[in-house]
Amino acid sequence: MPVVLVVNSGSSSFKYQLIEMDTETVLASGLVERIGEEVGSTRHKAGGDSWERELPIADHTAGFQAMLDAFADHGPSLEEGPPVAIGHRVVHGGDVFVEPTVVTEKVKADIDDLSALAPLHNPGALQGIQAAQTAFPDVAHVAVFDTAFHQTLPAEAYTYAIDRELAAAHRIRRYGFHGTSHKYVSEAAARLLGKPLEETRIIVLHLGNGASAAAVQGGRSIDTSMGLTPLEGLVMGTRSGDIDPAILFHLARHTDLGLDDLETLLNRKSGLLGLTGLGDMRDVQRAAADGDEDAQTALGVYRHRIRHYVGAYAAQLGGVDAVVFTAGVGENNPLVRRRSLAGLEFMGIGIDDDRNELISSEARFVSPDGSPVAVLVIPTDEELEIARQSLAATGN
């Protein structure tokens, strides 16, 4: 009965899940947060119960000790059932890491080097890896990269049309993100369709606060909407997605916004928040229903961008077997699904209203019977995918 511990670490917090791999059951999960602040906190769930605790947590090493204490106090026992592997989510693997990789000193140095491409994410992941190695010195640690799934993109999809020497010197290319989710969901879609993975053409729409689209052919990513960073592509909660780059030059010349201000503008003050003052899709929909014209426009922009990518990826794939919605908005918002695909019936893409309105946590069809293109809702499970990849990487 092998178990895998999955860790998703940031600069001041980390989440964890302990997963029994024979049945792929979550045995325990938790959150350690406010690391480095005067008072930190832990939350641990196991066996249907939950416990919370406040205590000083000086650093990630202390955070992992607090996690170990929670397992010792509330179970399940890590002494009786120690993990055979610990999987770490790492946002950016650049073009260095194309698959889940057992952590070595060289791997940690490479992750640190790639922090220039993901300064908000990779340093926290590295802190988590180092602390976890202290807590579990005799267990294999595996880094699973959000970007790895998209390393199969062809050159024409990942290359930006800028000076090639500058691009090479600064590692500028499309990397793509949410790869763990896109991989999990596209493989689940193939099973739901009853088709061999290598014969499928699937468009995955990962719609959460962050959002991305991917074209997956035969289980391999051939195009994706996020680029060098997670800023490109679809409209998101606070991120702009695609814009004309000259907008930044225009703002730099005609306002007092500096480089950091412009970066903050596009990452934290744009998207739905920038268009409406509201960053949550549910709030935007309520405002639109109440007649707010800005909210109505924002929803139109959001849907327009999704349709743009669905059409483009259908062309790149040479046809589509399924369009799949996943993540918080994609899984739970029937209105977004229906309106995002409205008008695509000429492509064989349509939604059955009754199926679409059904509230369920199960993977399911929301397209009519006999539809040329299946429309699916598949809950993502990035932690399980990380656990699967970690187990495979260690040979267990």
UniProtKB/Swiss-Prot annotation:
PROSITE patterns: ACETATE_KINASE_1, ACETATE_KINASE_2. Its cofactor is Mg(2+); Mn(2+). The active site is at D146. It catalyses: acetate + ATP = acetyl phosphate + ADP. One of its GO terms (cellular component) is cytoplasm. The keyword Transferase applies. Its EC number is 2.7.2.1. Substrate binds at R89. Mg(2+) binds at N8, E382. Coiled coil: none annotated. It comes from the Bacteria. GO terms for molecular function: acetate kinase activity; ATP binding; magnesium ion binding. The keyword Methyltransferase does not apply. Catalyzes the formation of acetyl phosphate from acetate and ATP. Can also catalyze the reverse reaction. Homodimer. This is Acetate kinase. The lineage of its organism: Bacteria, Bacillati, Actinomycetota, Actinomycetes, Micrococcales. The gene is ackA.
